[in-house]
Amino acid sequence: SGLQLLDLSNNREVEML
């Protein structure tokens, strides 16, 4: 698991491992 971030450039949620 990692930090859940919001990719504003693509309007989606991304998870950093």
Curated annotation (Swiss-Prot):
In its miscellaneous comment, the UniProt entry states: On the 2D-gel the determined pI of this protein is: 7.1, its MW is: 22.1 kDa.
Q: What name is this protein filed under?
A: Putative disease resistance protein PS10
